[in-house]
Design a protein with these regions (language model features):
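Glycine-rich, Arg-bearing micro-motifs that act as flexible, cationic patches
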Residues: 114-138
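Short, hinge-like loop/turn segments at secondary-structure boundaries
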Residues: 57-61, 109-111, 133-134
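Structural beta-alpha unit
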Residues: 1-7, 80-115, 122
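Short secondary-structure boundary segments
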Residues: 44, 118-120, 147
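A short acidic, glycine-rich active-site loop
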Residues: 60-73
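General small-molecule cofactor/ligand-binding pocket signal
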Residues: 43, 91-95, 144
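Small/aliphatic-rich secondary-structure junction motif
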Residues: 2-56
Length: 147
């Protein structure tokens, strides 16, 4: 997906959810974006099951908006602490639904040249596969998994 006449990725997308590994992934992606002169797209997906009551869904969506705003503020604070020449150009995006499918949609929509994501620490993901593993298996973008 690299365009002719460019020296590296134009857009690096990082999936974040507030876990330690996702914050490390965002920091890693920010460093890559800064060094490559790329735009960094930070994406938070509020997961929720399809089979929930409307009242529970609205509560989950409200909680997700709060989490997204907290993450955006955390990223703004981290960027502000960096010296001017060490900041990457970045934008923050939010979505709702299945994290894997939503991240794939964002990566396609944003024309991401690379995806960075934190490794899952959940035991069940070793059996059914984490979002990171599913992104790697999709084979559409170079994926970096940060521990």
């Amino acid at each position: 997906m690299f365009e002719l006449g460019t020296d590296g990725p134009l857009v690096i997308m990082a999936g974040i959810d507030g876990t330690e590994s996702s914050v490390r992934a965002a920091a890693y992606a920010a460093g890559l974006a800064r060094r490559q002169g790329s735009k960094l797209a930070l994406v938070y997906i509020q997961p929720y099951p399809a089979s929930v009551s409307p009242s529970a869904a609205s509560e989950m969506i409200a909680a997700g908006r709060t989490t997204a705003e907290d993450l955006r503020q955390q990223m703004e604070d981290a960027a502000a602490r960096l010296p001017e020449g060490h900041r990457a150009r970045w934008e923050f995006y939010t979505g709702e639904g299945d994290p894997f499918h939503s991240l794939c949609e964002f990566a396609t929509k944003l024309r991401a040249d690379a995806v960075v994501i934190g490794a899952s620490q959940k035991a069940g993901h070793r059996i059914v596969g984490s979002v990171a593993i599913r992104l790697v298996k999709a084979g559409k973008w170079p994926v970096t998994v940060v521990p």
